[in-house]
Amino acid sequence: MTKKKLIAGNWKMNGTLGANAALLQALRGGLEAGAYQNVDVAVAVPAAYLAQVQGLVEGSAIALAAQDVSRHEAGAYTGEVSAAMLQEFGVRYVLVGHSERRQYHGETDEQVAEKAQRALAAGITPVVCVGETLAEREAGQTEAVVKRQLAAVIHLNGHCISETVVAYEPVWAIGTGRTATPEQAQQVHAVLRAQLAAASEHADRIRLLYGGSMNAANAAALLAQPDIDGGLVGGASLKAQDFLQIIAAAA
C-alpha cells in the first residue's frame, strides 16, 4: 500500500506574528505552484500562535500541528493545553514525547503514552517521538531504547496504534548538524516497523518519520529508504525555500 509521505515542520520556540505570516505566505505560494499533492504537509507551532496559524493555513494544503498536549483532560494544571482545546483550533497532529520534552521536562515513556491517548480520543493524530542519545548509541542500546519508548505507547494505545505517526529522532543528531546516515536511519525504522507489525495488522499504514537534522541536502537520500515515510523537520522548516525543497524531495 502506498502511503502519502508526511513532511512536518517543528518550529520549536520560534516565531513572531510577522515572521509567521511571511513564512506561511511563502509556503502557501510554493505549495500552490508545485505539484505536491502526494505529500502531506504540517507545521507544529507554539501554542501561543495556534489561532493565528489556523487562520493563515485555512483553505491550504498545510495541516496545523501542536508541539505538545496535556495528559490530563481538564482542570487545575496551570500552563497546560488539553486535547479538547487543540481540537477547537482545528489541530490535526500533535507531537508527543519530543526529546526536548523528555530531556528538559522529565517526561517519562508512560506520560508520553498518556498524551498520545488523549490526542487519539480527541481525533488528533499523535506524532510519537522516539530516539536515543549519543551515549546510548555508543553503548549499543539504540534498539532497546527506541523499542522501550514505543512499547509504552503500544501498551496503552494498542487498539488504535495504527492511527498514530511515529518519528525517530536520534537525539545526537538534533540541531547538531550531525545526521544519521540513510542506512543508520533505515535500520532503526525497520526495527520500529517490525515492533508495530507485531502489535497491529495495519502496521503498514503507520507513517514513520525521520527527525534529526533533515535538510534540503540530505532529504532525498533519507526519504528513498523503504521504511522512511517522511520527515519531522526542525530548523529547515523556518525557511520557506528549505522546507519546500524537502517537500519536493518527498514528492
From Swiss-Prot:
Pathway: Carbohydrate biosynthesis; gluconeogenesis; Carbohydrate degradation; glycolysis; D-glyceraldehyde 3-phosphate from glycerone phosphate: step 1/1. GO terms for cellular component: cytosol. It is found in: Cytoplasm. The active site is at 98 (electrophile), 169 (proton acceptor). Substrate binds at residues 10-12, 175, 213, 234-235. InterPro entries: Aldolase_TIM, TIM_sf, TrioseP_Isoase_bac/euk, Triosephosphate_isomerase, Triosephosphate_isomerase_AS. It catalyses: D-glyceraldehyde 3-phosphate = dihydroxyacetone phosphate. Keywords: Cytoplasm, Gluconeogenesis, Glycolysis, Isomerase. Its EC number is 5.3.1.1. One of its GO terms (molecular function) is triose-phosphate isomerase activity. It comes from the Bacteria. GO terms for biological process: gluconeogenesis; glyceraldehyde-3-phosphate biosynthetic process; glycerol catabolic process; glycolytic process. It holds the Pfam family TIM. Involved in the gluconeogenesis. Catalyzes stereospecifically the conversion of dihydroxyacetone phosphate (DHAP) to D-glyceraldehyde-3-phosphate (G3P). NCBIfam families: tim. Belongs to the triosephosphate isomerase family. This is Triosephosphate isomerase. It comes from Paracidovorax citrulli (strain AAC00-1). The gene is tpiA.
